[in-house]
């Protein structure tokens, strides 16, 4: 019995070079995943603090943060649950701008991001500086919705998205690494999607 006509099965779709190993393109969707109930945070009461190993601990209220130099990120994001979303557009302020005001001490090597809910995640200082991380309040030209971390979330797009803490209120600089919520529960300390660092030992 003859097999299928040549070309009937079509060509295998080439993998997008922007897609890390083990990920799939979620398209226009943006799945909602949280470690805790979604809080209701008013912009009028929100603030962001940089403290810990810094010369000048500093807090910015909503209006004060919006007066800082605007910064944007246009690119891709990747979730540890294997979805990736291409061509996102976020706006807010660069973490570099916040740290320039607070002035990290020479012995600061790590950062713990804390959410309004108490959720925490740890990051090496080098992964949130040098134009690699932002505190954002806009998505796709409008306010960031609460289910996606609004009014304000951390954005560290080169790492798996659990590192981009939703409803962020504090960045604490530290001399030593201190695991956050998911890291204490078996997730990788760094979370590089290109190295598939999903869990401890990966």
Descriptions of predicted regions:
Residues 2-202:
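Structured, non-membrane catalytic/scaffold regions adjacent to prosthetic-group chemistry
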């Amino acid at each position: 019995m003859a097999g299928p006509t040549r070309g009937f099965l079509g060509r295998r779709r080439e993998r997008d070079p922007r897609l890390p190993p083990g990920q799939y393109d979620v398209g226009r969707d943006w799945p909602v995943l949280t470690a805790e109930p979604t809080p209701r945070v008013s912009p009028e009461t929100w603030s962001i603090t940089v403290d810990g190993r810094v010369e000048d601990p500093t807090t910015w209220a909503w209006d004060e943060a919006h007066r800082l130099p605007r910064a944007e990120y246009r690119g891709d994001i990747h979730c540890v649950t294997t979805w990736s979303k291409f061509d996102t557009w976020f706006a807010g302020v660069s973490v570099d701008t916040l740290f320039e005001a607070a002035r990290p001490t020479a012995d600061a090597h790590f950062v713990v991001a804390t959410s309004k809910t108490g959720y925490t995640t740890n990051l090496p200082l080098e992964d949130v500086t040098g134009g690699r991380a932002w505190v954002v309040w806009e998505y796709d030209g409008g306010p960031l919705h609460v289910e996606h971390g609004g009014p304000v979330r951390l954005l560290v797009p080169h790492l798996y998205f659990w590192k981009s803490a939703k409803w962020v209120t504090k960045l604490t600089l530290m001399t030593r690494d201190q695991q956050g919520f998911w890291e204490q529960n078996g997730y990788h300390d760094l979370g590089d999607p290109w190295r598939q660092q999903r869990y401890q030992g990966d």
